[in-house]
């Protein structure tokens, strides 16, 4: 019966798309140089780059909802962290000999510096306005308890001091000092408990929805940019001249139109995979997706909010995905401070918060079903974790909160359902399929269409991700003197690494902090800490990571 239902659904969708395409042929075809599918931060960032690089190019953006930045980019649907590995312990895994690997942390931090430079440049151009409306200084902290975890944090701190990007980090195992940094975390805690924390003053809270709205608002001021809301892509067809005809349905009046584009970017968040499959390019066959949602506990009580000014990340428990680590965060949303704790994983077959329950089934094909099965079989610990999260009660979530806020009161908190994150599953020659953390740009060989898949670190690295897309799709233009000069004006550090260059790191942090109105003090000498005891780690099966 299920197979019959699925088949009938697929036939209905297919017939609807054919009908839409036929109706659209009767209407006049719109032409555009660039079609941006999705009104989120990725499309907004790419459009902003292209507006400066090729101001004469025409652009059209289509968004299925009634406004932009209403899905994953919406401030309430994500953690709002400027991910720079200052506190996220999953970016510094422990090696078998007990040492700490910082390569991933350095790469994440370098990427966020590009985002800071991109935003600062847009403020100077008047594209982004009032930096405090979208980015604010919120110290980033790591906090752990227990001898093994404290030793890990010591080793992490010592390792990160070798990088110019982490020089301003502080370290302490003193209860009084940590209480000064984060009162909520320490008040009511056992004074004999062994704890440790790091704190970096230049951490940020970012409202990606506000950035998206401001970028798109600026794009709309140009006559060769068009924004179409309540518009859903129903079909994509490659033409003989390598342009694309995209059928777009108006969800309000039921009509359809064809848009002929020289280049198509699919920046539709969780919906990107299905649209990539619809394009028919062979590269799409390597991918599948698995949706995971997230919930947060939220407090707007002034007694809580005014007592906490930090993002405090812990360490994932044994058997849990590293990215699942709980954190208690100061957020600035809708112009006011709130505190969020989470995330707690949820499950839905939707690929978007405003998606369809058929999303997972309709994206499963004969070419990706086996990789999905391999991932499920190879990651049983992850499956157990997700099941345990879905089964959490209100009391379970509150007990998790009390580990980070011992004196928390139930009446101060409410549960909030955040957005959906579609994890990448990619075909693998050895394992059949692997779960990939991070984002991936998928494009055709001709460079006429590209999609962004994945979820983490996501919005905080939109600027470097879209730079990567430009290099992949417009390689010849990127290497031209004109584009090189423009890109280096947008991102002063473009083409070189900040890590290892203290003067360059401080120069860029000082520049972006001044323009964005962020706190920045020149780093002082590193804190003296006990020497970490590097203990060989027991061999354990690695738990696949997911983004929440």
Swiss-Prot record:
Q: Which cofactor does it need?
A: FAD
Xref: InterPro entries: FAD/NAD-bd_sf, MQO
Q: Which UniProt keywords apply?
A: FAD, Flavoprotein, Oxidoreductase, Tricarboxylic acid cycle
The EC code for this enzyme is 1.1.5.4
A Gene Ontology MF term for this entry? L-malate dehydrogenase (quinone) activity
Q: Which GO terms describe its biological process?
A: tricarboxylic acid cycle
As for family, the record states: Belongs to the MQO family.
Protein name, per record: Probable malate:quinone oxidoreductase
Gene that encodes it: mqo
């Amino acid at each position: 019966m299920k197979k019959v239902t699925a088949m009938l659904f697929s036939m209905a969708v297919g017939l609807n798309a054919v009908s839409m395409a036929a109706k659209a042929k009767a209407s006049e075809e719109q032409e555009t140089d660039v079609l941006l599918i999705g009104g989120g931060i990725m499309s907004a960032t790419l459009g902003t780059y292209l507006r400066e690089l090729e101001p004469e190019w025409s652009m059209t953006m289509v968004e299925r909802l009634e406004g932009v930045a209403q899905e994953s980019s919406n401030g309430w649907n994500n953690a709002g962290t400027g991910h720079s590995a200052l506190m996220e312990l999953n970016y510094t895994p422990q090696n078998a000999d007990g040492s700490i690997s910082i390569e991933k942390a350095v790469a994440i931090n370098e990427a966020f510096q590009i985002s800071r430079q991109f935003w600062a440049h847009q403020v100077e151009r008047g594209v982004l306005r009032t930096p405090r409306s979208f980015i604010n200084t919120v110290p980033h902290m790591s906090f752990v308890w227990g001898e093994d975890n404290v030793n890990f944090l010591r080793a992490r701190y010592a390792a990160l001091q070798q990088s110019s990007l982490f020089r301003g980090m502080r370290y302490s195992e003193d209860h009084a000092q940590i209480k000064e940094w984060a009162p909520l975390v320490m008040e009511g805690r056992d004074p004999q408990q062994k704890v440790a924390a790091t704190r970096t003053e230049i951490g940020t809270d970012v409202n990606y929805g506000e950035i998206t709205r401001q970028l798109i608002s600026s794009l709309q001021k140009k006559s060769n940019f068009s924004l179409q809301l309540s518009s859903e892509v129903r079909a994509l067809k490659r033409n003989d001249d390598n342009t694309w005809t995209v059928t777009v349905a108006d969800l309000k009046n039921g009509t359809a139109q064809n848009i002929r584009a020289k280049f198509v970017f699919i920046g539709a968040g969780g919906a990107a995979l299905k649209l990539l499959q619809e394009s028919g390019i062979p590269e799409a066959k390597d991918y599948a997706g698995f949706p995971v949602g997230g919930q947060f506990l939220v407090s707007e009580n002034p007694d809580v909010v005014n007592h906490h000014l930090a993002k405090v990340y812990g360490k994932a428990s044994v058997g849990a995905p590293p990215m699942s680590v709980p954190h208690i965060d100061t957020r600035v949303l809708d112009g006011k401070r709130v505190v969020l704790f989470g995330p707690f994983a949820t499950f839905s077959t939707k690929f978007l918060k405003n998606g369809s329950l058929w999303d997972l089934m309709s994206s499963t094909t004969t070419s990706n079903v086996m990789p999905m099965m391999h991932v499920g079989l190879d990651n049983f610990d992850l499956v157990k974790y997700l099941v345990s999260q879905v089964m959490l009660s209100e009391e379970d979530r509150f007990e998790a909160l009390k580990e980070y806020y011992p004196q928390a009161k139930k009446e101060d908190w409410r549960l909030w359902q955040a957005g959906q994150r579609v994890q990448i599953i990619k075909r693998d020659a050895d394992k059949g399929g692997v779960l990939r953390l991070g984002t991936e740009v998928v494009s055709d060989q001709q460079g006429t269409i590209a999609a962004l898949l994945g979820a983490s670190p996501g919005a905080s690295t939109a600027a470097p991700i879209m730079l990567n897309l430009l290099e992949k799709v417009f390689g010849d233009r990127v290497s031209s003197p004109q584009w090189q000069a423009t890109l280096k004006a947008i991102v002063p550090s473009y083409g070189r690494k900040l890590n290892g260059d203290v003067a360059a790191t401080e120069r860029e942090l000082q520049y972006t902090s001044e323009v964005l109105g962020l706190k920045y003090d020149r780093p002082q000498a590193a804190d003296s800490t006990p020497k970490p005891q590097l203990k060989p780690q027991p061999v354990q099966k690695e738990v696949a990571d997911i983004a929440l």
